[in-house]
Structure formats: C-alpha cells, structure tokens
A protein has these predicted regions:
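Catalytic active-site module of serine/aspartate enzymes centered on a nucleophile-bearing elbow/loop
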Residues: 271-307
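Active-site nucleophile elbow and catalytic-triad environment of alpha/beta-hydrolase enzymes
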Residues: 213-229
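Active-site loop/oxyanion-hole signature of alpha/beta-hydrolase fold enzymes
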Residues: 95-135
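Flexible "cap/lid" loop of the alpha/beta hydrolase fold
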Residues: 142-150, 156-196
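Conserved loop-alpha-helix segment in the C-terminal half of the alpha/beta-hydrolase fold
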Residues: 85, 243-285
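Alpha/beta-hydrolase fold catalytic core
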Residues: 2-4, 10-11, 18-67, 90-91, ...
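Conserved HGGG/HGGXW glycine-rich cap/lid loop of the alpha/beta-hydrolase fold
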Residues: 54-105
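Short beta-strand/loop motif that positions the catalytic acidic residue
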Residues: 233, 239-241
Length: 307
C-alpha cells in the first residue's frame, strides 16, 4: 500500500526552499551545532539496531510507557525539537531515523511504508517491547499507520500528525500537482534548506542525498487512498493537523467521522464521544512548523495518558 507519501510537502523546487526554511526558523532556538533540525541540545547518544538488513538508528529518551516517534520525509527524528524532552517527561520515547534518513543509511531495497513499518516492529522486538504507542508526522504518519495495520498487536494508541489519507482531496490541488516534481534532479536546489543541511551533517553517506530524493519522488508520484485501512485500524487514533496545513481542515473532519467522530453530542459524561478517535486542529500551525509546535506535545501527551 503506497499511502500518505505525498504528505512530505516536498513539492516544487521553489516551494521546497521557501517552506522548509519556515521549519528551520520555528525551531532554531532548540538546535545544536549540527545544523537545523539537529534536535535539542544535550540529546542522548543513539544506537544502531540490525533489523531487516538495515542498520536502524534510534535514540531513547525518558522513562515510562514506550512511545515511538517517526519523522517526516527528508528529516530525522531530531526534527521533533523540544517536543522530544516534553514527551519524554512521561514516556520512554524511542526516536527513530527511518530508512535513508538522518543517521540511517539507505540499503538496496525500495523505500516503502510497508518495509519501514516492518523495521519499526522489528526494532520493538529487538528492544523487547511488546506494545507501544506510535506517533508519526507526515511521512512518519504513513509509516505509523502501516505499523497499526500490519502489526496491530504491537500498537496501543496511534497519533497521526499532518497525515493525509488519500491523494484525491487530501491536499490542496496545487500542492498535489507540485509534489509530483520531486526527484534527485532538484538536489542542488535543495542546498541551503534545513533538510539538506541536516542530511549533510549526520548522514553516513552524504552522496546518497539525490538517491533519497529519487526514492521519495518515485512513490510521491503515485495516487493513493488509505481510507479503508484507516477505518479498519484496531487501535484508537488521535488525528492532528494544523489549521494552515497542506490539507484542508475538512479532510481532518472527514477522517474523524470515519472513526465515529463528530456524529453526536458527547454528553455531560462524555459517553457520546468516539471511542475510536480524537481530533485536534492546531491553531496557527502549518505543515512545515507543526512538528516542533509545543501544543502538539501537550495535546498528544494528554491523549496518550487517557485510559
């Protein structure tokens, strides 16, 4: 299932440079000397796990119920910024760099949501964690959804941030058209963006950046519809977007309704609320700065701590 990949927001050459710089500005105060999106200063040193033929980079922060954080396309786990220590106050946060991203080198296999979801499941097995909460942003939201679909017994709750369920109607039309232009051919034009700078700072093989763009571009060109998989999830979901995201708020409301949300008054005792989903629309947040927005950690933390 090629789903949610378009949510990466890496659209046209001009749009990439302009919008990604917004994300760098929004989290600049949290960065260390490794460059934009390098994460909060004093971050714990990471480790590598051999899973499915890939050396998967991960970090563990805090203690408590395990929470896996999955980053967006061309980013790394560190792009969650100060939301990492905020969530680690009450959770054992497992921060992962997905295939070909951050400190995890690419391997000779297609970059698919299914394969990356299986990597996460294998990592949890290796860490002897039978069940965890999984929170994904953009591309990471697609991976998180796949973990819930393919390994339902390993997921207690899901948090999907800025994650479209389908290409048709999931994005503003002009963005969908631009997304199909991503390829390694735009690598030089990415120089100066926070994603390029982060990759150059931490990637094991810096020469692979055009290859990463090619792989992401390949599946971004495909139309997708993950509605049926979203409906069939056996785990409760918090669906979160910004009110100025690359997808219209109506898409989030539609997703909420698919999980029995927004269909009745919740009642004084809350008995009428959906047991399958909650919806959060973060005010003033765009697709490019929501990942490090402190409200995200507050809303997600509250949701995850509910029975």
């Amino acid at each position: 299932m090629r789903t949610i990949q378009g949510a990466l927001g890496l659209a046209s050459r001009a749009a990439m440079v302009m919008t990604l710089m917004v994300a760098a500005t929004s989290s600049a105060a949290a960065q260390n000397t490794e460059g934009p999106w390098a994460g909060p200063a004093g971050a714990a040193p990471g480790k590598y796990a051999d899973v499915n033929g890939i050396k998967l980079y991960y970090e563990i922060h805090g203690a408590g119920w395990p929470l896996v954080l999955l980053h967006g396309g061309l980013g790394a786990g560190s792009m969650f910024g100060e939301n990492i220590p905020a969530l680690a106050k009450n959770h054992r946060v497992i921060l992962v760099d997905l295939q070909g991203h951050g400190r995890t080198a690419d391997i000779d296999r297609p970059m698919t949501l299914e394969a990356m979801a299986d990597d996460i499941a294998a990592l949890l097995e290796k860490l002897q964690i039978p069940q965890a909460d999984v929170m994904g942003y953009s591309l990471g939201g697609g991976v998180a959804l796949e973990v819930g679909v393919r390994h339902p017994e390993m997921v207690r709750k899901l948090v999907l941030v800025s994650t479209a369920l389908r290409s048709d109607g999931g994005y503003y039309p002009e963005l969908r058209a631009m997304q199909k232009g991503v390829s390694g051919a735009v690598a030089d034009q990415m120089k100066g963006t926070p994603m390029y700078q982060l990759y150059m700072a931490v990637a094991p093989r810096k020469q692979d950046f055009p290859r990463l763009l090619d792989k992401i571009g390949t599946f971004m060109k495909s139309d997708f519809d993950a509605t049926s998989q979203f409906v069939a999830l056996k785990t409760p979901v918090l669906y979160m977007i910004g009110d100025a995201d690359m997808m219209p708020p109506s898409h989030a409301v539609e997703a909420f309704a698919l999980r029995d949300g927004g269909k009745r008054d919740g009642g004084w005792d809350g008995a009428g609320r959906s047991k399958l989903a909650q919806l959060a629309i973060i005010p003033g947040a765009t697709h490019y700065d929501i990942v490090a927005n402190p409200v995200v950690a507050v809303v997600a933390g509250r949701y995850l701590e509910q029975p």
